[in-house]
């Protein structure tokens, strides 16, 4: 067991630890605030969602502490069974009685005592696998990279979950080019990516409606445009400093997904431009600090691993906040560390723990 733990006396990066805990505990507060109405409606207990989020936060913090002390090099030997295992789980969501279907998608697995969203685990596992593989593979890797990333992307798209698929693909591409891939590969991939996004957008009636509501939010105010209109009402109501914590009107079932995908809009309503700027800055700081740790890692594996986590959190937060600001189409993805959801929170905290272990072993 001692082989798994590094014995450096250097402490983990305090700045990254602080920003992760700040975002996570603020998330519990906002989950409680945003979910009061639906918690009473569905469970007769206004604290239900906050209590669940706090439970998962406790588990996540324990995972973060443990993984911050486990030598990150140990993960190198487990990446192959991990990637195969997560692909099996992504297929298992379609098994009747085991997979859970909700809101028109098969995204969850029911293990009895808890429900897991395999696509969240796939983000971290793919980062681990790519960091290990790209740190040793030097030539003829584009085809294999596209096959692996494309397989994970396709399995997530079958659920369907375009938002998570885009995060996975974007994170993988950043890691690929940070590993030293030639720019001619970028020139080859860019038109394929653009064409793929266009095809995915127009091939599904649901996604096409979301795209048209992005272009024209007034096109269907009581239907496809309803959520984005309520989001903009929330943000507009907040003004400069907000109407006050706990005073949101939109959380009373006017705004869909108020405690999950749309929680940034509740933050904007209650804390205004000042609050949303602070949260945006907090995510920017996390991304910068994780890349800072990556730049000082002792080896390529550590550099790519920390860079992958930084890219994941950066892409996901940009997509969520961009969608809530009507800068990009709605994608249905949670705000990292803040939105309600056990799988997302625990896995993000676990990933942060791995980055913290890299910081414990970084160059002075």
Language model feature labels by segment:
Residues 1-4, 320-364:
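A juxtamembrane structural motif centered on a specific transmembrane helix
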Residues 1-20:
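N-terminal membrane topogenic signal
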Residues 17-25, 29-33, 40-227, 265-326, ...:
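Hydrophobic alpha-helical transmembrane segments of multi-pass inner membrane proteins, especially
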Residues 24, 33-36, 248, 339, ...:
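Short linear Ser/Thr-Pro motifs
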Residues 35, 235, 239, 325:
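Short, small-residue-rich loop/turn micro-motifs
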Residues 112-122, 158-160, 239-244, 333-347:
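Glycine/serine-rich anion-binding loops at beta->alpha junctions
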Residues 164, 260, 331:
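Ser/Thr-centric signal marking residues that sit
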Residues 213, 217-260, 264, 271-275:
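TM-adjacent membrane-interface loops and short helices in multi-pass inner/ER membrane proteins
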């Amino acid at each position: 067991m001692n082989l798994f733990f590094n014995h450096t006396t250097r402490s983990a990066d305090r700045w990254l630890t602080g920003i992760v805990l700040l975002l996570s505990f603020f998330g519990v507060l906002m989950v409680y605030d945003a979910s009061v109405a639906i918690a009473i409606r569905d469970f007769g207990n206004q604290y239900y969602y906050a209590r669940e989020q706090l439970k998962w936060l406790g588990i996540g913090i324990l995972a973060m502490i443990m993984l911050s002390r486990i030598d990150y090099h140990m993960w190198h030997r487990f990446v192959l069974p991990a990637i195969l295992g997560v692909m099996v789980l992504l297929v298992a969501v379609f098994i009747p009685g085991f997979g859970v279907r909700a809101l028109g998608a098969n995204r969850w697995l029911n293990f009895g005592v808890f429900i897991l969203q395999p696509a969240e685990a796939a983000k971290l596992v793919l980062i681990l696998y790519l960091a290990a593989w790209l740190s040793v593979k030097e030539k003829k890797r584009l085809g294999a990279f596209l096959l692996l990333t494309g397989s994970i992307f396709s399995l997530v798209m079958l659920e369907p979950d375009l938002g998570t698929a885009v995060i996975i693909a974007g994170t993988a591409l950043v890691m690929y080019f940070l590993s030293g891939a030639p720019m001619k590969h970028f020139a080859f991939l860019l038109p394929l990516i653009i064409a793929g996004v266009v095809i995915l957008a127009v091939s599904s009636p649901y996604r096409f409606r979301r795209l048209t509501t992005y272009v024209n939010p007034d096109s269907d105010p009581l239907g496809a445009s309803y959520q984005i209109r309520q989001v903009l009402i929330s943000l507009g109501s907040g003004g400069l400093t907000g109407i006050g914590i706990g005073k949101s009107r939109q959380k009373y079932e006017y705004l869909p997904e108020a405690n999950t995908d749309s929680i940034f809009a509740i933050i904007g309503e209650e804390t205004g431009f000042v609050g949303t700027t602070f949260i945006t800055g907090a995510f920017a700081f996390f991304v910068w600090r994780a890349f800072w740790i990556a730049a000082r890692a002792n080896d390529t594996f550590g550099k790519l691993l920390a860079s992958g986590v930084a890219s994941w959190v950066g892409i996901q937060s940009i997509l969520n906040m961009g969608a809530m600001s009507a800068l990009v189409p709605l994608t249905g993805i949670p705000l990292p560390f803040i939105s309600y959801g056990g799988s997302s929170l625990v896995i993000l905290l676990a990933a942060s723990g791995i980055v913290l272990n890299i910081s414990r072993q970084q160059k002075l």
